[in-house]
Swiss-Prot record:
<dbReference type="Pfam" id="PF04361">
    <property type="entry name" value="DUF494"/>
</dbReference>
<comment type="similarity">
    <text>Belongs to the Smg family.</text>
</comment>
<dbReference type="InterPro" id="IPR007456">
    <property type="entry name" value="Smg"/>
</dbReference>
<protein>
    <recommendedName>
        <fullName>Protein Smg homolog</fullName>
    </recommendedName>
</protein>
């Protein structure tokens, strides 16, 4: 399912081509690209739920402190290792993620059918969430920089 999300993001969203095709047409294209029907349905449902989170009349979170500390459930810790959880905390500290967008990221991560998530895959989920939440253009650009910019020179001597 994650491969389909990446395919859609790279071929439609990130390339700035408008996604104005209907679901049946998109399903046919993804099938021609070699993806399985079951995974296609899961991926489209995942994207639909992401849009629902963003378009809801109610805020995603209510009654939260901006400087609260996130305690992860056992299931979340199983899917997001220490490195991934640390990265989410880092993104909050540099204000790429707010409390609300962090929770949206965790919600979408938990809906992926992978048992664990690599840091590189988490970065893409963050990018997808930020892209779909209006008013986060600056955070999206910062996240893009974190994904695409490679450090120059040697990190260690």
């Amino acid at each position: 399912m994650f491969d389909i999300l990446m395919y859609l993001f790279e071929n439609y969203v990130h390339s700035e081509i408008e996604l104005l095709v209907d679901e049946d047409e998109l399903t046919k294209e993804l099938t021609r690209a070699g993806f399985h029907q079951v995974d296609i349905i899961k991926a489209l449902s995942w994207l639909e739920h992401l849009a629902d989170l963003q378009e809801s009349d109610k805020p995603y979170l209510c009654n939260h402190a901006q400087h609260s500390f996130r305690i992860y459930t056992k299931a979340e810790m199983a899917k997001l290792d220490v490195e991934c959880r640390g990265f989410l905390l880092f993104l909050e500290q540099i204000q790429v993620l707010s409390v609300e967008t962090r929770e949206m990221v965790i919600d979408r991560v938990m809906e992926l059918d992978e048992p664990t998530l690599e840091l590189e895959d988490l970065k893409w989920v963050v990018l997808m969430v930020l892209f779909n939440v209006p008013g986060n253009e600056s955070a999206y650009e910062q996240m893009e920089d974190l994904i695409f910019e490679q450090p120059e020179g040697r990190l260690h001597s």
